[in-house]
Design a protein with these regions (language model features):
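Hydrophobic alpha-helical transmembrane segments
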Residues: 2-88, 254-277, 281-297
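Helix-loop-helix units of permease transmembrane domains in multi-pass membrane transporters
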Residues: 82-118
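Alpha-helical transmembrane segments of integral membrane proteins, especially early/N-terminal helices
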Residues: 24-43, 76-78, 114-124, 203-217
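Aromatic-anchored segments of alpha-helical transmembrane domains
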Residues: 37-45, 123-129, 188-200, 281-290
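Membrane-interface helix-boundary motifs at transmembrane edges
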Residues: 97, 106, 173-181, 262-273
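Pore- or pathway-lining transmembrane helices of multi-pass membrane proteins that form conduits
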Residues: 30-34, 179-197, 275-279
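Terminal transmembrane helical anchor/hairpin motif
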Residues: 2, 48-52, 184-271, 291-297
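Secretory targeting signals
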Residues: 42-76, 82-83, 109-178
C-alpha cells in the first residue's frame, strides 16, 4: 500500500508549488475576491432587509438566494480550473518531474487538491450565510425537519459537489481542446444548463411544429443547476435535491475523471483500468438519471 501511495499521490512539495502558482496568479485572486465580495454583499443586503413575519414565502425567497449562486460557482471554478491547467503547463512542472513516476497525473491531482480546499472555504462561507439566515428567520413556520434536511443537501450539492465537478470539467477541457475551443465549450455548457435552455427548447419546438423536434431530453444532460422557482420558492428546496440532479452531476464528474485519467495515464498496469472504470460509472449514472423515478421526491 505504501508503494501505491508513492505512485499515485503528489508529495507536499508539489502541492505547495501548485498552491504558490495559484496564489501568485493575479487573475485567480481577483476573480475569487470579486466572487467573495458578491456573496458578502448579497448576504448583507438580505440580512439588512425586513421581512414580514406573516409571510413564510418571503422568508423562503430570501433563503433561496444562496442557491442562485450555484451557476456563478460553476462558472468561476470551471474557468479558473481551466486557466490554472494552462498556467501550470506554462510553468512546465511535468518536464521538471521527468524522473518522477506519473508526473502529469500527480500535477493534476495536486491542482484538484488545491481547488478542493478553495471550494471548501467558499462552502463554509455559504454555510455561515445559512446559519445567519436561520437565526434571523428562526420564528418562521418553514423551519421543520424536512426543510432543514433539504437545505443542508442543497448546500452540499450546489456549493461543494457541483463546484468540484466544475473544477474537474475545467481540467478535462484543458486536455481535450485548445484554449479558445475549451472556453467556448464551457460557455456552451453553462448556457445549456441555465434557465435560457428552456427558451431554447421551446424555440426549437415552436419552429418545428410539423416534425415536433423535442430537444428537452437532450437538455436534461445539462440540468445540474437548481430550478428557478421564484413564484413558489418553497418547492425549490425539494426540487433541487431530487436524485436526477445528483446523478447528473456525478455523470459529468466521472466523465471528467475519465478524460483526465485517459489523457494523463502512463503505461502502467495499475492504472490501465482506471479510464474504463470511470467510463462505466459515468454511463451508469447517466442511465439512472434518465429514469423517470429519479425525478420524483
Amino acid at each position: 500500500s505504501s508503494d501505491l501511495r508513492v505512485v499515485t499521490l503528489p508529495d507536499k512539495k508539489l502541492i505547495f508549488q501548485v498552491r504558490t502558482i495559484f496564489l501568485r496568479s493575479k487573475e485567480m485572486i481577483v476573480v475569487l475576491s470579486l466572487f467573495m465580495f458578491s456573496i458578502v454583499a448579497a448576504m448583507i443586503w438580505l440580512m439588512a432587509g425586513n421581512v414580514s413575519a406573516l409571510y413564510d414565502d418571503a422568508a423562503l425567497g430570501a433563503l433561496d438566494v444562496p442557491l442562485k449562486f450555484s451557476l456563478a460557482s460553476f462558472v468561476v471554478f470551471s474557468f479558473l480550473s481551466f486557466e490554472m491547467s494552462y498556467k501550470l503547463r506554462r510553468y512546465k512542472l511535468d518536464e521538471c518531474m521527468d524522473t518522477v513516476t506519473h508526473a502529469k497525473r500527480k500535477i493534476f491531482l495536486a491542482q484538484g487538491i488545491v481547488f478542493a480546499v478553495v471550494i471548501f472555504a467558499f462552502f463554509i462561507v455559504f454555510n455561515i450565510w445559512w446559519l445567519i439566515s436561520f437565526i434571523k428567520y428562526r420564528n418562521f413556520n418553514c423551519w421543520h425537519g424536512k426543510f432543514i434536511i433539504q437545505t443542508v443537501l442543497n448546500m452540499l450539492l450546489s456549493h461543494f459537489f457541483l463546484p468540484c465537478c466544475a473544477a474537474a470539467m475545467g481540467m478535462s477541457a484543458s486536455l481535450l481542446f485548445h484554449r479558445i475551443n475549451g472556453c467556448l465549450g464551457l460557455v456552451l455548457f453553462t448556457l445549456l444548463g441555465s434557465p435560457l435552455s428552456n427558451y431554447l427548447g421551446e424555440m426549437f419546438y415552436s419552429f418545428s411544429r410539423d416534425v415536433s423536434i423535442n430537444i428537452f431530453p437532450f437538455l436534461r444532460l445539462f440540468d445540474v443547476f437548481p430550478p428557478s422557482l421564484n413564484y413558489a420558492p418553497i418547492f425549490a428546496f425539494g426540487q433541487s435535491v431530487l436524485p436526477y440532479r445528483w446523478l447528473t452531476v456525478l455523470f459529468w464528474f466521472m466523465l471528467s475523471l475519465f478524460v483526465i485519467s485517459l489523457k494523463t495515464g502512463e503505461r502502467n498496469r495499475r492504472f490501465r483500468a482506471a479510464p474504463a472504470v470511470f467510463a462505466l460509472f459515468a454511463f451508469a449514472f447517466l442511465v439512472v438519471s434518465q429514469i423517470p423515478a429519479s425525478r420524483v421526491a
